[in-house]
Amino acid sequence: IDGRALEQGKRFILHFGACDYKTEVWVNGEWAGTHVGGHSSFSFEITDLLRDGENVLVVRAEDDSKNLEQPRGKQFWKQESASIFYTRTTGIWQTVWLEPVESQFIRQVWMTPDVDQKMIGMEILLDQKTEARLKVEITYKGTRMVCDTVTVLNGKAVREWKLDQNLNLEWEHKSYEWTPEHPALFDVHYKLECEGAAVDEADSYFAMRKVSVENGTFLLNNRPYYQKMLLDQGYWRGSL
């Protein structure tokens, strides 16, 4: 760790994509946190546990094969695999990374598309319950759809935008809707400002997609969509 980053007030978030099943984390001998669940992502702020130069990270992962109430998919609870069950596994199985952030940053954004109303709704959550301004720009195939500034109060904001002002022809031909054959995506750029200074920026994307069921028929964007529902499954002798 570069000591200058610590001196400049940077905060450091340690992210785990997933670790099976119960995870305990220590940094430089100090406990950082515990997470239970083998498929969900999690993170810990470890700023106060870091020191300039080399740091030691210890991760302990436990998967109790005797606990039959624990979600495990098809992992076998016995020592050796048998029948259709998978080999027992434990530990980190998704990416782990360290993220430097400012004292205030965008923690999470929930995006909810409304195909029928041609709208996108967003719920924005900052790391701290403070007041800030968030600039949001939405583009589609390079065309700007939304350019707005949201006032964030108490660390949270909720906003909806209409998306059809500049895409009348596109909306008529449904080319904006996401399907497996035409995976159309809208790009989003966020810029967070506190006291007039930019403190965080992030890029994301979303799709205009609606999934529903009517009279027993699966619908994608209000139209019947046939699903093959195939399972392609294999076993590798060296592991499974």
Residue locations for each model-derived region?
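Secreted/periplasmic carbohydrate-active enzymes, especially glycoside hydrolases
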Residues: I1-L240
